[in-house]
Curated annotation (Swiss-Prot):
<feature type="binding site" description="axial binding residue">
    <location>
        <position position="378"/>
    </location>
    <ligand>
        <name>Fe(II)-heme a</name>
    </ligand>
</feature>
<feature type="topological domain" description="Mitochondrial intermembrane">
    <location>
        <begin position="41"/>
        <end position="50"/>
    </location>
</feature>
<keyword id="KW-0186">Copper</keyword>
<keyword id="KW-0813">Transport</keyword>
<feature type="transmembrane region" description="Helical; Name=X">
    <location>
        <begin position="371"/>
        <end position="400"/>
    </location>
</feature>
<feature type="binding site">
    <location>
        <position position="45"/>
    </location>
    <ligand>
        <name>Na(+)</name>
    </ligand>
</feature>
<feature type="topological domain" description="Mitochondrial intermembrane">
    <location>
        <begin position="358"/>
        <end position="370"/>
    </location>
</feature>
<feature type="binding site">
    <location>
        <position position="290"/>
    </location>
    <ligand>
        <name>Cu cation</name>
    </ligand>
</feature>
<dbReference type="GO" id="GO:0046872">
    <property type="term" value="F:metal ion binding"/>
</dbReference>
<dbReference type="InterPro" id="IPR033944">
    <property type="entry name" value="Cyt_c_oxase_su1_dom"/>
</dbReference>
<feature type="binding site">
    <location>
        <position position="441"/>
    </location>
    <ligand>
        <name>Na(+)</name>
    </ligand>
</feature>
<feature type="transmembrane region" description="Helical; Name=I">
    <location>
        <begin position="12"/>
        <end position="40"/>
    </location>
</feature>
<keyword id="KW-0408">Iron</keyword>
<keyword id="KW-0249">Electron transport</keyword>
<feature type="binding site">
    <location>
        <position position="291"/>
    </location>
    <ligand>
        <name>Cu cation</name>
    </ligand>
</feature>
<dbReference type="InterPro" id="IPR000883">
    <property type="entry name" value="Cyt_C_Oxase_1"/>
</dbReference>
<keyword id="KW-0496">Mitochondrion</keyword>
Length: 516
């Protein structure tokens, strides 16, 4: 029974659990890689070896965290668990395809790890730019394995996206409008549309790279009339929507958590929140070249991409101020998920402000490929996406398991993590402004102080990760069961108890529309 239940599952709750476990495991691999990076950079001089092995670690860290930690947890884990429950659907629209979406990920992960283990590894950075990723600078199978890994992860995400789009539009009760579904459902829907439109472009780009490497095509080789800049355009046309794919489900989670712990029955400005997410999704597709300000674009092109990028701050600001308005006048419960959510709002805003700085092409030409950029995107990912994951996990853990976490331990864990990530990434702004470049394993002594501080911060974050594992162990051994949940009238996912039965909404939900 156990083998068929977990290997052949078509149940959205089981598949969601598989995604969460897989994501947690990948997250530990990614954390280990990041600690290798910070160990190498903790003082001047070499630790691990040359820049090739260093860049292999950096590349693997990025791919593992993005494709095997954040996306599986936010979209696969929370999405599978919550979307059907929130819209009153018995399961996802295509339950067997759902199973395949998950089981494409472990082989994909295996291929990525294999790419590090053969030849010299793929030391290209997660962007995999040619000519560095070509068959001269990276002879051997490493980059090819990385490309195949991305193909599998991409197919997984595309199938998942089709599934979520069909489910959210087609499987809600007929009397319910799309504008009556919870914000997390909207967030996943917008995310799925972004995935569906952006991933095929990445697939095209890396497939052309594959043929350039192995079949003597010259898509990205000027010697045969190709252009390496074409690859950058294809990659970033995927890569920029991708960063919004990583954060949008987090926005949805934060909306739910903030409303719940502020004692509100709904978040402030529901329609504004929905349209802001759709605006972010649309704008995310027309700003990609802000990653390429240094490739020699025309000044008018740079002016457009600078302006368009800054426009994204408007819908993002709508969301931030709506969260603050949701808090306003609420009877705030200072429980751990609320702490994560408040941390998210503050730190995501800081990351957004450095993003506005980098949107200016004139400034970006100076700051491009420095640690200022690293600090910027780790503030929105390591303290945006990850804080949202933690807020959602601590909030919905009783729903997923029926057990409660120890609230004292989770609060301490939040405090340790908060100090750790800020100590790790805040000093990197200083390093970037002082001109320290990314993707080098060594640096002049002048940069030693802030690098050492940053590496100490990473060790504090490691302590937080270990604490989290202990907290999970404690919850499953203590087995404190959930007594009751408040606010179920406006939080449909809790309706069936903790944990919900294996099959929910087996007969269609009865929905009475309020006429006012």
């Amino acid at each position: 029974m156990t083998i068929t239940r977990w290997f052949f599952s078509t149940n959205h709750k089981d598949i969601g659990t598989l995604y969460l476990v897989f994501g947690a495991w990948a997250g530990m691999v990614g954390t280990a890689l990041s600690l290798l990076i910070r160990a190498e950079l903790s003082q001047p001089g070499a630790l691990l070896g040359d820049d090739q092995i260093y860049n292999v670690i950096v590349t693997a860290h990025a791919f593992v965290m993005i494709f095997f930690m954040v996306m599986p947890i936010l979209i696969g884990g929370f999405g599978n668990w919550l979307v059907p429950l929130m819209i009153g659907a018995p399961d996802m629209a295509f339950p067997r395809m759902n199973n395949m979406s998950f089981w494409l990920l472990p082989p994909s992960f295996l291929l990525l790890l294999a790419s590090s283990g053969v030849e010299a590894g793929a030391g290209t950075g997660w962007t995999v730019y040619p000519p560095l990723a070509g068959n001269l600078a990276h002879a051997g199978a490493s980059v090819d394995l990385t490309i195949f890994s991305l193909h599998l992860a991409g197919v997984s995400s595309i199938l998942g996206a089709i599934n979520f789009i069909t489910t959210t539009i087609n499987m809600k009760p007929p009397t319910i409008s799309q504008y009556q579904t919870p914000l997390f459902v909207w967030a996943v829907l917008v995310t799925a549309v972004l995935l569906l439109l952006s991933l095929p472009v990445l697939a095209a780009g890396i497939t052309m790279l594959l043929t350039d490497r192995n079949l003597n095509t010259t898509f990205f080789d000027p010697a045969g009339g190709g252009d390496p800049i074409l690859y950058q355009h294809l990659f970033w046309f995927f890569g920029h929507p991708e960063v919004y794919i990583l954060i949008l489900p987090g926005f949805g989670i934060i909306s739910h958590v903030v409303a719940y712990y502020a004692g509100k029955k709904e978040p402030f400005g529901y329609m504004g929140m929905v349209w802001a997410m759709m605006a972010i999704g649309l704008l995310g597709f027309i700003v990609w070249a802000h990653h390429m300000f240094t490739v020699g674009m025309d000044v008018d092109t740079r002016a457009y991409f600078t302006s368009a990028t800054m426009i994204i701050a408007i819908p993002t600001g709508v969301k931030v101020f709506s969260w603050l308005a949701t808090l306003h006048g609420g009877a705030i419960k200072w429980e751990t998920p609320m702490l994560w959510a408040l941390g998210f709002i503050f730190l995501f805003t800081v990351g957004g402000l450095t993003g506005i700085v980098l949107a200016n092409s004139s400034l970006d030409i100076v700051l491009h490929d420095t640690y200022y950029v690293v600090a910027h995107f780790h503030y929105v990912l390591s303290m945006g996406a990850v804080f949202a994951i933690m807020a959602g996990f601590v909030h919905w853990f009783p729903l997923f398991t029926g057990y409660t976490l120890n609230s004292v331990w989770t609060k301490i864990h939040f405090g340790v993590m908060f100090i750790g990530v800020n100590l790790t990434f805040f000093p990197q702004h200083f390093l970037g402004l002082a001109g320290m470049p990314r993707r080098y394993s060594d640096y002049p002594d002048a940069y030693a102080l802030w690098n050492t501080v940053s590496s100490i911060g990473s060790l504090i974050s490691l302590v937080a990760v270990i604490m989290f594992l202990f907290i999970l162990w404690e919850a499953f051994t203590a087995k404190r069961e959930v007594l009751s949940v408040e606010l179920t009238a406006t939080n449909v996912e809790w309706l069936h108890g903790c944990p919900p039965p294996y099959h929910t909404f087996e007969e269609p939900a009865f929905v009475q529309i309020q006429s006012n």
